[in-house]
Amino acid sequence: MTLKAPFPWFGGKADVADEVWRRFGDVRGYVEPFAGSLAVLLGRPEPFDGVETVNDLDGLLSNAWRAIRDKLAEVAVYAAKPVSECDCHAEEIWLLERKAEITAQLEANIDWSDARAAGYWLHGICCWIGSGFCD
C-alpha cells in the first residue's frame, strides 16, 4: 500500500515515486539523505521489512516526522485549522524562536518530539505561499 506525502515540498518527488520504485526494484535497504516529504519512501509499492534510513538537517521537519509517528492526534489539534495570515506569521515567529532548541532536543533524545511545533510547522508549510517558511 502506498501513502501520499502529507505536505507539499519543493523538490518533492511525489510525481515520480512510482517510476523510482519501478527502476529500483525490490531493494533490501533504503536510504533517504534529504527526507523532505518522504514522497518516495511513502510511495513504496510493496511491504518492506528491511532497513529504512531517513535523514534531514532541518530540525523542524525532523520534529514533524517524529511527532507524526508518535503523537499524531495531538499534532492534528495544532495543524488542522482554517488558514489565517496572522496565525501563519505568529506560528512562524514562535517556531523560529525555538528552532535551535527543538533541534538540540531531537539530537539529545531519540524519544523526544514536540506536537505543538510539528502542528504549527505543518500548518505553515501547507498554507505558505512561495518559499521561505521558517527559513
Annotate each PLM feature:
Residues 47-135:
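Class I S-adenosyl-L-methionine-dependent methyltransferase module
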Residues 1-35, 39-40, 46-47:
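S-adenosyl-L-methionine
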